[in-house]
């Protein structure tokens, strides 16, 4: 995260600036990010995760508890049937698209339906949940309908590329079913990539691309690689850190191992998520940009023209 945005967010949380002022800083940094990505030769752009709200804040029927006496981990309250009227992410994408030139594709990141379901179940008191949703299937129906509306809204705004972020280790049957249902019901022509733990990906049906944490300790490598065989797999060649130049040979060897399972025409590279850095600094930010250049070098090795 840029230092100017970190500072603005800190001042906003301290009551020193308004939400409108924070939004203006976010907008400026997103414009700078788009232009920097273009100058680096990147053709898919995002807002960098620079917006500052909770994804569930705009949902109907659910809110964050305001009392400090809430049980630990039970921070959400279901107040009625869950749904969506207008999510601010629609306005955020409109801003991203308006500032993206014709030679780049704007991509929107969204928590996966299964991830949202599991968060609601984990952070809501069971008694409160039962009073509104005595049958879990009704909750699944409401979440599926809300996501359908959100994806249709994004599609109407011009979005053609969504990346769902899924859970990293835990999975329930209900979460898997919900993910697959939302994928089935998405607008035709909406490309969806899915980034999640191995177990989630193996049970996923209908995604266009898979973001794979190949170096993840919970990853059953051979099982996962056979799963993505003959699929349009997006392979993340590094997970939790930004590599140095001297590590390229090692990373190339890992990529070449993957080519035993995935045709090169179905393979691409993705960079580690900046959110993996717990305390981002200006030095980390510069290393992120250096990694963009290293990724281009790696792509030249793996995908020679």
Region locations from a protein language model:
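Domain-level signal for soluble alpha/beta catalytic cores
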Residues: 1-305
């Amino acid at each position: 995260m840029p230092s100017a945005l970190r500072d603005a967010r800190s001042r906003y949380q301290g009551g020193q600036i308004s939400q409108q002022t924070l939004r203006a800083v976010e907008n400026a940094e997103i414009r700078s990010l788009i232009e920097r990505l273009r100058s680096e030769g990147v053709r898919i752009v995002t807002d960098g995760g620079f917006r500052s709200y909770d994804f569930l804040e705009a949902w109907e029927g659910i809110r964050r508890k305001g009392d400090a006496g809430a049980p630990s981990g039970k921070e959400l309250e279901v107040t009625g049937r869950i749904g969506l009227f207008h999510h601010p992410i629609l306005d955020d994408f409109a801003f991203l698209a308006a500032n993206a030139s014709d030679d780049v594709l704007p991509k929107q990141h969204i928590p996966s339906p299964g991830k949202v379901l599991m968060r609601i179940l984990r952070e809501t008191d069971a008694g409160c949940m039962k009073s509104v949703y005595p049958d879990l299937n009704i909750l699944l129906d409401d979440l599926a309908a809300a996501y359908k509306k959100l994806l249709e809204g994004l599609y109407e705004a011009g979005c053609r590329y969504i990346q769902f972020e899924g859970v990293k280790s835990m999975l329930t049957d209900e979460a898997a079913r919900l993910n697959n249902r939302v994928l089935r019901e998405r607008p035709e022509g909406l490309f969806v990539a899915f980034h999640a733990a191995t177990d989630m990906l193996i049970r996923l049906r209908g995604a266009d691309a898979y973001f794979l944490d190949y170096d993840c300790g919970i990853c059953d490598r051979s099982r996962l690689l056979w799963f993505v065989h003959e699929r349009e797999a997006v392979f993340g060649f590094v997970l939790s850190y930004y590599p140095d130049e001297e590590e390229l040979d090692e990373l190339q060897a890992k990529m070449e191992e993957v080519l035993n399972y995935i045709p090169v025409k179905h393979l691409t590279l993705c960079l580690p998520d900046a959110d993996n850095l717990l305390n981002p600094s200006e030095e980390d930010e510069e290393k992120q940009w250096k990694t963009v250049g290293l990724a281009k070098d790696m792509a030249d090795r793996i995908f020679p023209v």
